[in-house]
Amino acid sequence: MTQEYSTLRNNISMLGRFLGETINDAQGEDILELIENIRKLSRNSRAGDDKARQALLDTLGSISNENIIPVARAFSQFLNLTNIAEQYQTISREHSLAQSSSQSLSELFKRLKEQNASVEEVHKTVEKLLIELVLTAHPTETTRRSLIHKHIEINKCLSKLEHHDLTEKERNIIERLLLRLIAEAWHTNEIRTVRPTPFDEAKWGFAMLENSLWQAVPEFLRQLNETAREFLGYDLSVGLKPVRISSWMGGDRDGNPFVTAQITKKVLYFARWKAADLFLQDISKLADELSMMKCSDEFRDKYGEHLEPYRFVVKNLRNQLTATLAYFDDHLSNRTPRVSESEIILEDNQLWEPLYDCYQSLIQCGMRIIANGSLLNILHRISCFGVTLSQMDIRQESTRHTDAIAEITRYIGLGDYSQWMEDDKQAFLIRELSSRRPLIPQNWTPSPETKEILDTCKVIAQQKQGVIACYVISMARSASDVLAVHLLLKESGVPYHIPVVPLFETLEDLDAAEKVMTQLFNVGWYRGVINNRQMVMIGYSDSAKDAGMMAASWAQYRAQEALVNLTEKLGIELTLFHGRGGTIGRGGAPAHAALLSQPPRSLKNGLRVTEQGEMIRFKLGLPAVAVETFDLYASAILEANLLPPPEPKPEWRTIMDELSTISCDIYRGVVRGDKDFVPYFRSATPEQELSKLPLGSRPAKRNPNGGVESLRAIPWIFAWMQNRLMLPAWLGAGAAIRQVIEQGKGDIIHKMCENWPFFSTRIGMLEMVFSKSDTWLSQQYDQRLVKKELWYLGENLRKQLEDDIQTVLSLSHQSELMSDLPWIADSIALRNIYTDPLNLLQVELLHRFRENPEQVNPDVEQALMITITGIAAGMRNTG
């Protein structure tokens, strides 16, 4: 690693040394020597020593069941410690001094000034800025909450050690604490013994809000204001809401039978309880601070004459929040509430108005510095979190709504709605939506499945407007899918409009998105209720699983572009909701590059994007890291709107159409067309064993008896990442590029790389995937776990991977992958030394596991789970 990363190198070395001491104390010298020998063999193997490679295979294959767990844990925990050190590096003083990121807000405003950008235009764009992060429960978040807490404490220790004026005694105290935390982690079982419930997942999300985002959001808003003020010459408005937090935890029931209406209600109560708790802590501290006696005449007229007027107001709020806490505590405990709704805080304005009055009075009385202290932080939190802490999305699969309405129409003698033509469905739905009479008879008893759908809608009806952000329909394919949800909400007594969001996921659905939305917008009733605002969700995971990365990316781009043009023509404000994941196969890319590769004008109403599991932890898990993430998002959105990327040239579109068709044919030819593919996939990856790992509450398959098509996109990608073939993220892409170049269109491809962010980002993503892949390791899975007659498939795929790597290198004019980002290349090289043994151990363990699946040794099963989580840590992503 380069000189500027000396602290990172030193931190990794120190953490590794402390882990070694811990292992020595816990397991003894023999185990430590074995681990150290494996590490050296792995390092030499990576350096090209064939003898070391064979010795590594022999050593790992001969480890007893008894010793295999500590060996797996050692490499897994080292990779977790490396992740901690790298996460800290991004916010360290050394990193800040060494790099002035061209992607930061401050650098963007410098460029805007150099280009004489209009102050008025910049101000208008900043005031419209919206970053809405939707936190989702990730079924492959492999790290337990108990360990995450220890990892946060380790990060804090690294921060303290960066102070150069520490005495030797102070340094020793911090290092002893580090050693203790590493020992605590070693003696903690990293594998959950039980699968988390949806409520557990929601509590995990709220813990992240409390421990990181609660501090990060006000800090980011201050940073945004200071940076903008240098350009504008004045402050942004206090009520600015550039960050909004929403959540699928407790609301996403697509394919998860454990998320019920009762769970949704419980999570909503818990969110309000947690919000009251956090605001109560803030308000109690504020009561100590606001001891000033002077206030404005308007403030005195409104709140009366008091010796300490601000404390009077704040203490009243404290009493209301205390009552609010008790009210929701009673609901969560299934007790009759001790206080009435009239005594508690249910609306944001009940908090905002009195505190904003305090803020204005303090400024009018010459106490701006006090107003801009803790009070301003609380106002920012009210703006961004509100008294519900986050808004909730409800998500359900489209056929569940179709089945519910079909059950109703059959009962009332209208026939089977699910069998009707689309025009007939729409006519029926519009007629019922326009009718004042109820559709559902009072004496009707629905099936349990339909009752659950209706109960969920009734829970929505019980909430105040704004608590539920939207209702997302997965696998949306028609206008009737959207109208059906509106009808179910109406029949359940929802008294206000809720945005209903179609999620277009497959290649065919993305291509049809414009047509579906045009049909919807042509419905008079629908145009009347949406108030010229529409949200559409773009699915990245399932489209990539359906058609491969290249075809899916282009379909996503074209769908967004078409929707932007359609809504602009109709005068409708469009918000695009991006269902991205952390991996390339799920739309993942560095945030700044990903946003600037979107179609022009697609971010003018802000960004709404899912943040999942381990990516929440990596990008938002520490306050300083979260501030940097918000800064990158804000910079990219503002740049996309103020300095938009170029429209793709007609010849670029033609090339992308060709690449899409060729790559999709290649991808589907393997995944769908080869009869041996499914048995090969099941043998060559730990896909079957993944279901045994109690990671998330949601089952890995929509249909437990189905094949690859029924497998969720996340475990599909997770399985291929484990065996280092990384197939979903590249299959078809490189081969398609190669074919187009061979047709004599290489010059156009090179121009696309140089001048079109969309295409250059795709190539950069491929390069990252290739850097993490490994054909030799993939071959070890095949030779040990796959029947010989299926080996040809792996050999063909690895040959294609090697050819694709050469194709991408030729485009970037480089001899080695990631040579333009040396610190990332170095990081991957370091991780490989520790991840390789885990991969080889996993091969050995899968072999032992499958030899006698009815009587698996518990140590083998436990060690296998550890290799899965360790490889996930080494790859820095799961699914």
Curated annotation (Swiss-Prot):
InterPro entries: PEP_COase, PEP_COase_bac/pln-type, PEP_COase_Lys_AS, PEPCASE_His_AS, Pyrv/PenolPyrv_kinase-like_dom. It holds the Pfam family PEPcase. It catalyses: oxaloacetate + phosphate = phosphoenolpyruvate + hydrogencarbonate. GO terms for biological process: carbon fixation; oxaloacetate metabolic process; tricarboxylic acid cycle. It comes from the Bacteria. Keywords: Carbon dioxide fixation, Lyase, Magnesium. GO terms for cellular component: cytosol. Gene3D superfamilies: Phosphoenolpyruvate/pyruvate domain. Its cofactor is Mg(2+). Belongs to the PEPCase type 1 family. Forms oxaloacetate, a four-carbon dicarboxylic acid source for the tricarboxylic acid cycle. This is Phosphoenolpyruvate carboxylase. It comes from Haemophilus influenzae (strain ATCC 51907 / DSM 11121 / KW20 / Rd).
